[in-house]
């Protein structure tokens, strides 16, 4: 199991200073406080020989391994693709935002005009209502006058007929 964790197959891990703040750090370093090593490329089970003894070709630099380089190339391509898609999405959102702002301004102007038209229509309706009420009152008065003449035997005066009616005997006598 320790063979799978040897540094020859994995890239060197970056140093993270926050791990020293973990509560288990004090326990781990209590037994050997003077021999703290941050080199995780070698297993503690191997002999502490020099690097020349391992340079017989069995140890490959993790930064130069083909798998690592291929992984980095794929990651770089994915990052470029992600950046391009994000830029495209942001540009699309920006143009859509500008379009919506223009539409909103046009709708606000249309709303303003509609409110003005509504106010004018309300004034016209009020004036027409007042005029209608005046006509209704006048009509009621005329009906009352008409009913007054219809109920009585009195015939309303008609000056034109009276002037031209030749059946009246005193027609010419009044002129003398």
UniProtKB/Swiss-Prot annotation:
CDD domains found in the cross-reference section: bZIP_BmCbz-like
Basic motif: region residues: 67-92
Segments of skewed composition (Low complexity): 47-57
InterPro entries membership: bZIP (IPR004827), bZIP_sf (IPR046347), C/EBP (IPR031106)
PROSITE patterns assigned to the protein according to its UniProt record, in alphabetical order: BZIP
Record's compositionally biased regions (Basic and acidic residues): 58-80, 91-101
Biased composition (Basic residues): 81-90
Region Leucine-zipper, residue ranges: 100-107
Single GO biological process annotation from the record: regulation of transcription by RNA polymerase II
Region (Disordered): 44-101
Regions annotated as coiled coil: none
bZIP domain span: 65-128
An example molecular function term from Gene Ontology annotations: RNA polymerase II cis-regulatory region sequence-specific DNA binding
Homology family: Belongs to the bZIP family.
Protein name: bZIP transcription factor 8
Organism: Caenorhabditis elegans
């Amino acid at each position: 199991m320790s063979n799978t964790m040897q540094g020859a197959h994995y890239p060197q891990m970056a140093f993270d200073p926050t791990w020293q703040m973990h509560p288990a750090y004090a326990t781990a370093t209590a037994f050997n406080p003077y021999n703290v090593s941050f080199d995780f490329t070698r297993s503690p089970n191997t002999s502490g020989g020099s690097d020349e003894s391992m340079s017989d070709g069995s140890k490959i630099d993790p930064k130069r391994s083909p798998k690592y380089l291929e992984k980095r190339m794929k990651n770089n391509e994915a990052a470029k693709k992600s950046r391009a898609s994000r830029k495209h999405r942001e540009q699309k959102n920006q143009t859509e935002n500008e379009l919506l702002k223009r539409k909103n301004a046009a709708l606000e102007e249309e709303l303003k005009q509609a409110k003005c038209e509504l106010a004018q229509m309300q004034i016209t309706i009020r004036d027409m209502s007042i005029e209608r009420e005046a006509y209704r009152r006048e009509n009621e008065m005329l009906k009352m006058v008409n009913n007054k003449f219809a109920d009585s035997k009195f015939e309303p005066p008609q000056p034109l007929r009276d002037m031209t009616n030749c059946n009246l005997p005193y027609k010419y006598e009044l002129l003398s």
